[in-house]
Design a protein with these regions (language model features):
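Conserved acetyl-CoA-binding loop-helix of GNAT-fold acetyltransferases
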Residues: 78-81, 87-103, 237-248
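GNAT/GCN5-related N-acetyltransferase fold signature
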Residues: 46, 59, 81, 203, ...
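Conserved active-site alpha-helix within GNAT-family acetyltransferase domains
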Residues: 103-108, 114-132, 264-280
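Intrinsically disordered, low-complexity, positively biased terminal segments
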Residues: 2, 9, 149-394
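Short amphipathic alpha-helix that is part of the acyltransferase structural core
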Residues: 1-61, 66-75, 141-184, 226-227
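Aromatic-anchored glycine-rich loop motif in surface-exposed flexible loops
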Residues: 129-130, 136-144
Length: 394
């Protein structure tokens, strides 16, 4: 089917919402945020010969933290295709166009949450992690009080920028987390608190915010009642213990609390995780938009030095394909065209998994995403550093 691919106009956003609602469900009336033009966000549409919108995709234009540096991302959301045209390659054309446009605007990497992973695998994305949360019985939480020098108090809506600054102190040395700056993050909310948030509890050390609990109360106070924590942040063990004590104070009216955690973060050393009653995990996928930028723009472990050459396969983004040499030194890295033919090869999906430190070279070789006559353990250089994580759904 011949398609016209272009950016949607403001007048076409209601039709875009209707298409998304058909795919994912939702209210008949679009929320105001869905009908606004957001700076930096690119909404692409596919139109048939009659001018009917038959598919759409959104480039959310985030930035991700990688080793203390901001990396421009083309994170993907809202992929939807009309049922009459599904299976006809509409999504493939839209996502290929998104990658071309994203590279032109300077994007280096891309993440998404798949509904059907096979579609995205065929286009070079691969599962590299999961967005998770842990559910705990509030009665199992230690009732810890704040130590001298810390102040625990309710937060106000106008203090949310302080929470963002605290998040940045936590997130910037990790891999893959959104910066939560720019685009829709800078938009004024329609309500004093974000959707689903009822209150904040803050911990101060003097004038410095060192801990924040942002949560939704939920409904009821019986056995099914649950506190839904949106953000749980701290930069010191004492601040973490103080916030866990606040959560424990909900024992009489909420039987469970659902908390997002980062691997090895300060709350992981304070909470009784062995008492977790349930959890959830939503897979996310990653891919390079431009491999040269993806390597050069991020921070790398300062103690790692090395080189490895490989042939990269990328049929969808041909500018990434070819023979490359990766060199890492002094907390930085470069990717240059290899002078000689490499003895290792790497599929772009394998590049994504290694880049996110989700596996090593030899294990990747068992998946068929890497190979060659050389030892695939040499590809561990691309995977050096902490594993990538996400805390935001989009």
């Amino acid at each position: 089917m011949p398609l016209t691919l272009r950016e949607l106009t403001a007048d076409e956003l209601p039709a875009s919402w209707a298409l998304g609602r058909m795919a994912f469900g939702g209210p008949a009336e679009a929320p105001a945020r869905a009908l606004r033009v957001v700076p930096g966000m690119t909404r692409l549409g596919a139109f048939d010969e009659r001018g009917t919108l038959v598919g759409k995709v959104v480039d959310v234009a985030h930035e991700q933290w990688w080793g203390g540096r901001r990396v421009v991302a083309a994170d993907v959301s809202g992929v939807a295709v009309r049922p009459e045209t599904r299976g006809g390659g509409v999504a493939r054309q839209l996502l290929t166009e998104l990658l071309v446009r994203a590279r032109e605007r300077g994007a280096a990497v891309s993440a998404l949450y798949p509904t059907v992973s096979a579609v995205y695998r065929s286009l070079g994305w691969e599962v590299a992690g999961s967005l998770g949360a842990t559910e705990l019985d509030t009665a199992a939480l230690p009732r810890t009080r704040a130590v001298d020098g810390l102040t625990v108090r309710p937060g106000e809506p106008d203090e949310l920028p302080l929470v963002t600054e605290l998040y940045e102190r936590v997130a910037r040395q990790r891999q893959g987390l959104l910066t939560r700056r720019g685009g829709h993050f800078d938009e004024a909310p329609d309500t004093p608190l974000p959707e689903g948030v009822d209150a904040l509890s803050l911990v101060f050390d003097g004038d410095l915010l060192v801990g924040a609990l942002v949560f939704g109360r939920g409904t009821g106070y019986g056995v099914e009642s649950k506190l839904d924590v949106h953000h749980l942040l701290a930069t010191t063990p004492d601040a973490a213990r103080a916030l866990v004590g606040v959560l424990a104070g909900w024992t009489t009216v909420t039987r469970a609390v659902r908390v997002p955690l980062l691997a090895g973060d300060v709350f992981s050393t304070v909470l009784p995780l062995e008492r977790a009653s349930a959890g959830s995990a939503t897979a996310w996928m990653h891919r390079p938009v431009d491999v040269v930028r993806a390597v050069a723009d991020r921070g790398w472990p300062a103690h790692v030095t090395g080189r490895v050459s490989f042939r990269l396969r990328d049929d969808v983004a041909p500018w990434n394909a070819g023979d490359w040499e990766l060199e890492v030194a002094d907390g930085a890295a470069t990717l240059r065209r290899a002078a000689t033919e490499p003895d290792l090869w790497l599929d772009v999906r394998g590049f994504a998994v290694l880049y996110c430190a989700a596996t090593g070279g030899r294990a990747l070789g068992q998946t068929g995403l890497a190979g060659g006559s050389g030892d695939p353990a040499a590809l561990d250089l691309l995977a050096c550093g902490p594993r990538a994580e996400l805390l935001d759904y989009f």
